[in-house]
């Protein structure tokens, strides 16, 4: 069973967001990484790029599939996880810690209300 931390918010496209001081750390869920299998490559957005919620921001590739990454929130990309360039498997091993993808300076914290809670995300997974 996939881990779904209660303190995070989730997009229906399987990204998660954790907000601290107006900055959202974004990654893909344990469920998503498990479905993808062992990741071999992660393409991330550019620092300084401005994104809207739902914008495609990168790609994760495994030995069996490639999947687009979408930003669950709007704002400016302020940091990317450069460790993933050499160690994409961090997304598999620690998706909610060292496997985060990028950080976004939020332009509208109210968007978080449109994301799923852990219980809502679990219900979505169960219905897939």
Swiss-Prot record:
Which parts of the sequence carry N6-lipoyllysine?
Answer: 64
Instruction: Check the record and name the InterPro entries matching this protein.
Output: Biotin_lipoyl, GCV_H, GCV_H/Fam206, GCV_H_sub, Single_hybrid_motif
| Family annotation (NCBIfam families) | gcvH, PRK01202.1
Q: Which organism does this record belong to?
A: Alcanivorax borkumensis (strain ATCC 700651 / DSM 11573 / NCIMB 13689 / SK2)
Q: Which GO terms describe its biological process?
A: glycine decarboxylation via glycine cleavage system
What PANTHER family does the record tag this protein with? GLYCINE CLEAVAGE SYSTEM H PROTEIN, GLYCINE CLEAVAGE SYSTEM H PROTEIN-RELATED
The identity of this protein, by name, is Glycine cleavage system H protein
* Boundaries of every Lipoyl-binding domain copy: 23-105
- Purpose of the protein: The glycine cleavage system catalyzes the degradation of glycine. The H protein shuttles the methylamine group of glycine from the P protein to the T protein.
Q: List the disulfide bonds.
A: none
**UniProt superkingdom:** Bacteria
Cofactor section: (R)-lipoate
Subunit structure, per the record?
The glycine cleavage system is composed of four proteins: P, T, L and H.
The entry sums up its family as follows: Belongs to the GcvH family.
Q: What is the lineage of its organism?
A: Bacteria, Pseudomonadati, Pseudomonadota, Gammaproteobacteria, Oceanospirillales
The gene it comes from is gcvH
Name a GO CC annotation attached to this entry: glycine cleavage complex
Keyword set, alphabetical order: Lipoyl
User: One Pfam match, by short name?
Assistant: GCV_H
- Cofactor annotation remark: Binds 1 lipoyl cofactor covalently.
């Amino acid at each position: 069973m996939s881990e779904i931390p209660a303190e995070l918010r989730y997009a229906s496209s399987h990204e998660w967001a954790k907000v601290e001081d107006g900055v959202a750390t974004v990654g893909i869920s344990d469920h998503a990484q498990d479905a993808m299998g062992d990741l071999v490559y992660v393409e991330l957005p550019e620092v300084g790029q401005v994104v809207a919620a739902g914008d495609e921001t990168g790609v994760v590739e495994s030995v069996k599939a490639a999947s687009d990454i979408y930003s669950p929130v709007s704002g400016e990309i302020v940091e990317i996880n450069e460790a993933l360039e050499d160690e994409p498997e961090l997304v598999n091993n620690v998706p909610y810690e060292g496997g985060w993808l990028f950080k976004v300076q939020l332009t509208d914290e109210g968007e978080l209300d449109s994301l799923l809670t852990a219980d809502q995300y679990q219900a979505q997974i169960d219905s897939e």
